[in-house]
């Protein structure tokens, strides 16, 4: 228990404690209010930072949205650029298609150029005349301008000479003036120097006198010294003046030289200014043209830039409007946020007031709570700062991406412009290439036309030369034929001599025939020995082939020979003199055939030498000539064998069968030669240009030759049947014309079947028709006439043509008519040989190589010659055969006039275009 005296102390202590507690409570409230203010300020700062972060976040979101929109625009721009690229590629493909169409059009134009050749030739002649006239006019103008130029040059030279004379006079005058002035100055200087020297001498004398009087006159010595000093000073002044005058003299010389040089420079400058004025005039003219072009280009560029600027400004206005709308929305959202924050602030103040009332009751818990909240806020601030740094980095990256996208967009725009420029340049390049190709094609066609015209003129000249040579040879052959006919006529008029006399006569004829040819034929014989060897080798090959290939009507001929009896014994017993005459005639025909074969080779050799094609392709030409030679030998051999058959006594149906078999064999040999040549061409391919030139026409020529050979076979069979009609036959013999006709029909069918594959293969094999061109030289006038008539008909009519059926044989007549038929057949064989010679010597059988150009008809002399021979060889009782031959020759003579009607004008072919 406390004492009573301690109560006031306790009360005082309580009062002190209450006051302390109140002071502590007031201090604590002050501290809490300060802390509350601090927390409020920190909260406001945090809220401000939060608002800034929210605004930054919203701004970043807007930036991202704008970037997405820009990316979408970029994607659309890239898609549009891709579409433009695809459109450009489509345009390029269309341009390629148009280029192909242009090539086709060029090909068509080339074909039209071929059709308009004659018009072009006329136009060329007119243009040539106009060019000559213009050339003469321009030459007159050039002469006039040359005279004007010479006059101007002469006047300028005269003016230059006058200026040179004036300059020389001025130079001489200046030099004279300068020399006179120099002489005056030198004279003056010399006078002054003399005066100075005189004064110097006088002063020296005075000095000497003064020196002499020095001892006596000391007072005068000082004066003399002073006068000496003055004299030295004057002397120095005079020397300085002399030096200055010398400098002036040098200056005058330099001035005169400078004046002369200035005058020369002025003259040179006048010339240079005249040249410069001319150059400046030209340059100004060029600069005006260039400035005009640059002005147009600048106007176009400024227009394009103005359009682009307008587009950019429109896009900028749209972007600014969108930005203003976004800013207004942000402002409204900020006002809403500010109202929300004010409400939240009032609520927070009320809450803080309630918290302040509760803090007084639980200070420790509040301190702990505040510390925890401070720590959490610090952590939040730190996280917000980190997020702010991240957002700033993201914003920087987005800005970099935006810059990169802008650069890519600018590069894409530049690429687009470059692509447009490349497209325009490509169009111009294509146009230029098309123009160049068209110009080159026109130049090539013109060069081809010129080359063809030159080649045509050269070939015409060479053909004229060969025709002259052939005419000379024909004159020689006419002389030989006339001599032979006269000799035979004389022998027949005086009677046939004995065999010994015949042998002597034949030897004499051989000597005459050897000595008679002219020196030209002898020279040609010496040149063609190598060709004869080749022809002999080919003849051997043809004989081997003829032995290998069986004739189609051999069985019929053998049956005919078996059914017919051998009339040789009876014939020898009946007419021995006539048989001897026939044998002698056969021997002479053999010898004559050899000479004619040599003449034919001599005729073919200059044609081969004069051919322009032999230089470009010698190997192919040699092979075709040897092949043609073999065909000639085969055909000539066939004619000789036919002549032998006609010369014998059994010259009736056996001779006709042999002739038909020989002609059928010749057709088979022709087909075989064509196939062999095709195989050879397959083994040795030619150049494409030569193949294009020669393939179509040579194949058509071979087909034409085959058809004409068939027609000749049919005509010869018909001719033989007519001859058999007029001839006499024994009663016991039977002639089988039906078998010959059947065999002939089979031969025609077989050759027609061979024609189809050969025609198909002829499209791919060149030079196969050169055999036909050589065989054309071996056919008779009837074949030539048939070629003229067939060229005007269609190929279908040629293939549908067939020989007429043979006529029935008549009853046999007397024995004399049989001898008449055999002799007429022999004369027909001789006529065939002469026709072969005439056709071989004519240029139409060798030079007929074009498709549309028909062959030239045989000369009328070639048709009249066999009639003379027939009249010379036939006996007086041969009117029927002679009339038949005369009709045949008359018909062949009238054919050239008909053939002229169906001839077409020659057409120059463009070998640059593929068929």
From Swiss-Prot:
A single cellular component GO annotation: centriolar satellite
- Highest rank taxon of the organism: Eukaryota
Tell me, how does this one assemble?
Interacts with CEP63; the interaction is required for their location to proximal end of centrioles. Interacts with microtubules.
Annotated region (Disordered), positions in chain: 555-574, 606-653, 724-915
The UniProt regions of compositional bias labelled Basic and acidic residues, in chain numbering, are: 745-758
Question: Which species does the entry assign this protein to?
Answer: Homo sapiens
Which residues lie within the region annotated Microtubule binding domain? Answer: 606-915
A GO BP entry is: cilium assembly
Query: Under what name is this protein listed?
Result: Coiled-coil domain-containing protein 57
